[in-house]
């Protein structure tokens, strides 16, 4: 039987683009681990993706995961859009390159053999874990230590 893990994620950006951060909480039974990091220049969507990626990459074995995010971009991207993006060689229906393709590919790889249920939670609505992730993300964004290598400013 697969381990049942809960993951909660959030991303934050002080300006968009601007300094950003992500926060994630992973829970297995009574054990909890938090993740966060801040980047000097990035976007909110990239930080939302990073939160999910980092938490999923931390799983050491195949798990059954409920991943809660307040990002419709992440949830819809992974449940509705990614299949066609991959079929089209990471292009949108308009034949344009998928934005944040580096992170979508990394998230796709991080899914591995996990059984994942993607849940959307309303942000800033009192959901305790989402509020904690938001605090982690905002604190990390306030003290960025890393460069977001894949960030490409819009031209």
Curated annotation (Swiss-Prot):
Cofactor comment: Binds 1 Mg(2+) ion per subunit. May bind a second metal ion at a regulatory site, or after substrate binding.
Listed GO CC annotations: cytoplasm
Assigned keywords, A-Z: Cytoplasm, Endonuclease, Hydrolase, Magnesium, Metal-binding, Nuclease
Annotated GO MF terms: magnesium ion binding; nucleic acid binding; RNA-DNA hybrid ribonuclease activity
Cofactors (names): Mg(2+)
Sequence ranges assigned to domain RNase H type-1 in this UniProt record: 1-142
Positions that bind Mg(2+) 2: 10, 134
Record carries keyword Magnesium: yes
Annotated EC: 3.1.26.4
PROSITE patterns membership: RNASE_H_1
Enzymatic reactions: Endonucleolytic cleavage to 5'-phosphomonoester
Residues at which Mg(2+) 1 binds: 10, 48, 70
Compartment(s) of residence: Cytoplasm
One of the Pfam families matching this protein, by short name: RNase_H
Function of the protein: Endonuclease that specifically degrades the RNA of RNA-DNA hybrids.
Known partners and oligomeric status: Monomer.
Family, per entry: Belongs to the RNase H family.
Protein name: Ribonuclease H
Name of the gene: rnhA
């Amino acid at each position: 039987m697969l381990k049942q893990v809960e993951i909660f994620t959030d991303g934050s950006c002080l300006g968009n683009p601007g300094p950003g951060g992500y926060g994630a909480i992973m829970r297995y039974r009574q054990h909890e681990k938090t993740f966060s990091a801040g980047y000097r220049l990035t976007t909110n969507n990239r930080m939302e993706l990073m939160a999910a990626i980092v938490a999923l990459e931390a799983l050491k074995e195949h798990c059954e995961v409920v991943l809660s995010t307040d990002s419709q971009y992440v949830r819809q991207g992974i449940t509705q859009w990614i299949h066609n993006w991959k079929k089209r060689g990471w292009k949108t229906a308009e034949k344009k390159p998928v934005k944040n393709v580096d992170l979508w590919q990394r998230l796709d790889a991080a899914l591995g053999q996990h059984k994942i249920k993607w849940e959307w939670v309303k942000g800033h609505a009192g959901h305790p874990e989402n509020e904690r992730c938001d605090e982690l993300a905002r604190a990390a964004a306030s003290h960025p230590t890393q460069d977001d290598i894949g960030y490409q400013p819009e031209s």
